[in-house]
Design a protein with these regions (language model features):
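Membrane-embedded segments
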Residues: 12-104
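Short catalytic/ligand-binding loop motif for oxyanion handling, primarily in non-cytosolic enzymes
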Residues: 26-27, 77-82, 215-220, 261-264
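Well-ordered, non-membrane alpha-helical segments in soluble/globular domains
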Residues: 54-55, 185-195, 229-242
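Secreted/periplasmic serine-hydrolase-like ester/acetyl group-modifying domain
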Residues: 72-73, 82, 86-204, 300-322
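Active-site segments of SGNH/GDSL-like serine hydrolases
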Residues: 199-225, 254-258
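Substrate-gating cap/lid alpha-helix
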Residues: 218-253
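Acidic carboxylate-rich catalytic motifs and surrounding loops in phosphoryl-/glycosyl-chemistry enzymes
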Residues: 250-264
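Histidine-centered active-site loop/cap adjacent to the catalytic His
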Residues: 266-313
């Protein structure tokens, strides 16, 4: 989508955009339109960092009058605040149309041109509603429904790694959050540059931030390797909520205090949830629920932490050893 988004944004009549990682790639633009109004399209980029999405946002605002943006605030990217290389595609979004030809100078497109092919592989799909859906693909559906589904279908590398970690676990360590000793100023500057700047520059556009609820298992395993990770996430989320409170055209929504993330049956791996959560997120935006504020963020984070601590790894380990 880093390449395809250019044509979609330029050539289609949309005024509202879903932009995030794979966590919102299966959010229905049609459903968003029905629940929120507006003409929606999903232009999310799998595994995208904030600096990548900033390239897309800049182009969107140059091309369109934007009513609304739904943006996934992935906690992994939030606390890493790392840059991802964009040089091999960001020239598509500059003001020079002539250099766009560079994207076609590769074996794939040269072969397509020589064959005058109109196949989907060469020209893409016109069905923008399902173009980037992943949760309805057969190879993903087989992992939903319980941890036994993970054990039955081990092709996914992410699932293989989880099974390996649990199998090799000698003792079950409790979820202990190590206090953060480093500053988060770098992350705050990163968020200000690649995210808050757009909110401030475009006060007539509504920004809705979704915190994707990773499974409790993800946090338990992440804590073993990075014991201060959750402390950093808490500090940054509290700061983010405080900042959003000062921006009248932005809201942030959280779902980690629900029971949903307790059930691994809702996930195809450690972080990717089923489409019912995408619908719940749209409902929250439409109904004004699950909004995080300075008044409720402490209780929200405490509930989230308590649920992570209470998550029992023993049944999963026992199932592996059967």
């Amino acid at each position: 989508m880093r390449v395809q988004d250019k044509g979609i944004i330029k050539n289609y009549d949309f005024d509202s955009f879903i932009l995030g990682t794979s966590m919102v790639m299966s959010t229905s633009a049609r459903e968003a339109g029905e629940k929120l109004g507006g003409k929606w399209v999903n232009v999310s980029l799998a595994g995208s960092h904030f600096n990548e999405r900033a390239v897309i946002l800049q182009y969107i605002f140059r091309q369109k009058s934007v009513a609304r943006v739904i943006y996934s605030l992935d906690t992994a990217q939030l606390h890493e605040a790392s840059m991802k290389e964009t040089a091999n595609w960001d020239f598509l979004y500059d003001n020079n149309e002539f250099n766009d030809i560079k994207i076609y100078i590769n074996q794939k497109y040269i072969l397509c041109a020589l064959q005058f092919s109109s196949s989907t592989k060469c020209v893409g799909s016109k069905d923008l509603e399902t173009l980037i859906y992943w949760a309805t693909r057969v190879e993903e559906i087989i992992y939903f429904g319980g941890f036994n589904k993970w054990l039955e279908n081990k092709k996914k590398i992410a699932v293989q790694e989880v099974i390996k970690k649990l199998r090799e676990m000698q003792t079950i360590s409790p979820f202990n959050t190590k206090p953060l000793t480093e500053s988060v100023e770098r992350q705050q500057r990163y968020i200000e540059k690649y995210l808050f700047s757009f909110i401030k520059e475009h006060p007539s556009t509504q920004f809705d931030f979704i915190i994707p609820p990773y499974s409790r298992l993800w946090y338990r395993l992440d804590n073993l390797e990075f014991p201060d990770s959750f402390s950093k996430i808490k500090i940054l989320l509290k700061w983010f909520v405080q900042e959003v409170q000062t921006l009248p055209n932005a809201k942030i929504y959280g779902f980690d205090d629900l029971d949903y993330a307790d059930d691994i049956a809702n996930y195809s791996d450690l972080i990717h949830y089923n489409t019912d959560m995408n619908s719940m997120q749209l409902d929250a935006i439409a109904n004004g629920t699950h909004i995080l504020t300075p008044e409720n963020i402490d209780e929200y984070l405490q509930t989230m932490e308590n649920k992570i601590k209470a998550y029992d790894l023993a049944p999963l380990i026992q199932e592996i050893k059967k």
